């Protein structure tokens, strides 16, 4: 026997949401199976992209990750041994050498810019800027 409450649910349905058939997207916590399928899709895509992974053989997720790491390291070695890059490394000591900015720095900069942009009054933004921001 199921227990039930005579009190109605407090959740409101917006008329516009109901009439347009718009539903809220679930978070991964709400639907762990969708997260699992999404991760499996990502592993399948990695398997397609990395040339050293045999396509006709079943490989574990761990093997896929190992192949991906090896492939990234191989690409880094190939990039570092490219003649243009090698010539940059052999510059005179007084010259600036090109260095790669860590992604964490770039992500932090983007977050700061996003926060600053959200503080501007909307009337000061041009129509082009509004289209880009929202």
Curated annotation (Swiss-Prot):
- Where does this chain carry the motif Nuclear export signal? 106-115
User: Which keywords does this Swiss-Prot/TrEMBL entry list?
Assistant: Biological rhythms, Cytoplasm, Developmental protein, Nucleus, Phosphoprotein, Repressor, Transcription, Transcription regulation, Ubl conjugation
Q: Posttranslational modification, per the record?
A: Ubiquitinated in a ASB4-depedent manner, leading to proteasomal degradation. Phosphorylated in vitro by CDK1, PKA and PKC.
Family annotation (Pfam families): HLH
Q: Which residues are listed as membrane-spanning?
A: none
Q: Which CDD domains match?
A: bHLH_dnHLH_ID2
**Annotated ranges, domain bHLH:** 23-75
Could you tell me which PANTHER family the record lists for this protein?
DNA-BINDING PROTEIN INHIBITOR, DNA-BINDING PROTEIN INHIBITOR ID-2
User: What is the protein's known function?
Assistant: Transcriptional regulator (lacking a basic DNA binding domain) which negatively regulates the basic helix-loop-helix (bHLH) transcription factors by forming heterodimers and inhibiting their DNA binding and transcriptional activity. Implicated in regulating a variety of cellular processes, including cellular growth, senescence, differentiation, apoptosis, angiogenesis, and neoplastic transformation. Inhibits skeletal muscle and cardiac myocyte differentiation. Regulates the circadian clock by repressing the transcriptional activator activity of the CLOCK-BMAL1 heterodimer.
Please give the name of this protein: DNA-binding protein inhibitor ID-2
